[in-house]
């Protein structure tokens, strides 16, 4: 089998017992399968939930806390217990682990985004298994990923993974809830994830986790946009992950095996960078950006909104107000206001910035579903 870079996400329900406590037998089963993958030469990055589930028992809670403070306190206690379990288990296979705790803010800064990539790839080059979790004990609501499903999708994207494997307590995606409808149909393969499927999906699937099927669909949709194929399902035994890579997994395969990765710079522009303003463009510029792969020139700009600086990321909308993409601008809002609608030669007379483009095509990402820009 071809050596692959694989992101494996393990949910809380796949790590805990019926009471919600950390189950070391389940944890070891996952560890054994990851160790087997590494022995075969694959690169593995582990995204793990379970900190809150591991910590609420020692804190004296009878079940998973519902308040933010309770969850964060449980995560503070549970993260150490969770890592202790992983370190002890992986040590039996001679595997060194490295812990990385992230918040949404780590993805906003382009410098931190690149530093994160460098750290993880260095760990992989040294044979270390990166174990990643959201830093639940310090995250505030507006800086969270929502669940580790989305975190796993974002990590698989910027690491240019070959596959994202999301392990859960349900063996794949269904057209209805299989726990309440025994006639629910399981999908063995889905070419893509539609908005209608996401709207029809329910909420959290268990009392010990935050990620139900809806979050997994959203994560799969995001991973596919990065060029990463996805598997959602379950399994047991040391060969379960390799079986999944070979197409023999008990779950749902989503997307083609490989259809090209989105560049890391464009991932940051499209999904992570703060949006500093908005530019409206005419029909000709819209066609040039979406269909001809051209850069945005001053002549195509019809309106400027916000107070952004040069090299900020802005949204680009058409004359109907629909967002068609995002890009990194070479002009500040005030400079662009002076040169909008002008030819490139005329624009040079009014600005000290002699760049002909407002947004170069290398710093542009289309967000229109019918147009894919790599």
From Swiss-Prot:
EC main group: transferase
GO biological process, one term: L-proline biosynthetic process
Subcellular location per the Swiss-Prot or TrEMBL entry: Cytoplasm
Residues at which substrate binds: 49, 136, 148
List of residues binding ATP: 9, 168-169, 210-216
Keyword Nucleotide-binding found: yes
EC number in record: 2.7.2.11
An example Gene Ontology molecular-function term: RNA binding
Domain PUA: start-end pairs: 276-351
Domain of life: Bacteria
Main location: cytoplasm
Disulfide bonds: none
UniProt xrefs under InterPro entries: AceGlu_kinase-like_sf, Asp/Glu/Uridylate_kinase, G5K_ProB, Glu/AcGlu_kinase, Glu_5kinase, Glu_5kinase/COase_Synthase, Glutamate_5-kinase_CS, PUA
Pathway the protein contributes to: Amino-acid biosynthesis; L-proline biosynthesis; L-glutamate 5-semialdehyde from L-glutamate: step 1/2
Catalytic activity: L-glutamate + ATP = L-glutamyl 5-phosphate + ADP
Keywords: Amino-acid biosynthesis, ATP-binding, Cytoplasm, Kinase, Nucleotide-binding, Proline biosynthesis, Transferase
GO (cellular component) term, any one: cytosol
Function: Catalyzes the transfer of a phosphate group to glutamate to form L-glutamate 5-phosphate.
Similarity comment text for this entry: Belongs to the glutamate 5-kinase family.
NCBIfam families named among the record's database cross-references: proB
Name of the molecule in the record: Glutamate 5-kinase
Organism: Geobacillus sp. (strain WCH70)
Upper lineage: Bacteria, Bacillati, Bacillota, Bacilli, Bacillales
Gene name linked to the record: proB
């Amino acid at each position: 089998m071809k050596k692959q870079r694989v992101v494996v996400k393990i949910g809380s329900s796949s790590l805990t017992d019926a009471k919600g406590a950390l189950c070391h037998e389940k944890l070891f089963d996952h560890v054994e399968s990851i160790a087997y993958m590494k022995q075969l030469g694959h690169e593995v990055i582990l995204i793990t939930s379970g900190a809150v589930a591991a910590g609420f028992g020692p804190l004296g809670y009878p079940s998973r806390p519902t308040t933010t403070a309770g969850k964060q306190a449980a995560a503070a206690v549970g993260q150490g217990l969770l890592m202790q379990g992983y370190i002890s288990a992986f040590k039996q296979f001679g595997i060194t682990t490295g812990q990385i705790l992230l918040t949404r803010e780590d993805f906003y800064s382009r410098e931190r985004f690149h530093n994160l990539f460098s750290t993880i790839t260095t760990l992989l080059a040294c044979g270390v298994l990166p174990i990643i979790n959201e830093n639940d004990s310090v995250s505030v609501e507006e800086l969270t990923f929502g669940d580790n499903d989305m975190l796993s999708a974002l990590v698989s994207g910027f690491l240019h993974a070959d596959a994202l494997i999301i392990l859960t307590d349900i063996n794949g995606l269904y057209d209805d809830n299989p726990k309440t409808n025994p006639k629910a149909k399981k999908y063995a393969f889905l070419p893509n994830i539609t908005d209608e499927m996401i709207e029809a999906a329910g909420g959290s699937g268990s009392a010990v986790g935050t990620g139900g099927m809806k979050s997994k669909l959203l994560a799969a949709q995001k991973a596919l946009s990065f060029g990463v194929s996805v598997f959602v399902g379950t399994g047991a035994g040391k060969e379960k992950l390799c079986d999944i890579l070979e197409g023999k997994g008990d779950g749902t395969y989503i997307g083609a095996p490989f259809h090209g990765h989105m560049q890391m710079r464009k991932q940051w522009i499209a999904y992570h960078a703060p949006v500093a303003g908005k530019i409206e463009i005419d029909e000709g510029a819209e066609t040039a950006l979406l269909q001809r792969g051209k850069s945005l020139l001053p002549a195509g700009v019809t309106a400027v909104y916000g107070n952004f600086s040069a090299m900020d990321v802005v949204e680009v909308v058409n004359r109907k107000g629909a967002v068609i993409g995002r890009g990194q601008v070479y002009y500040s809002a005030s400079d662009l206001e002076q040169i909008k609608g002008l030819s490139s030669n005329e624009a040079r007379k009014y600005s000290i910035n002699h760049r002909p483009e407002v947004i170069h095509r290398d710093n542009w990402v289309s967000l229109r579903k019918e147009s894919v820009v790599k």
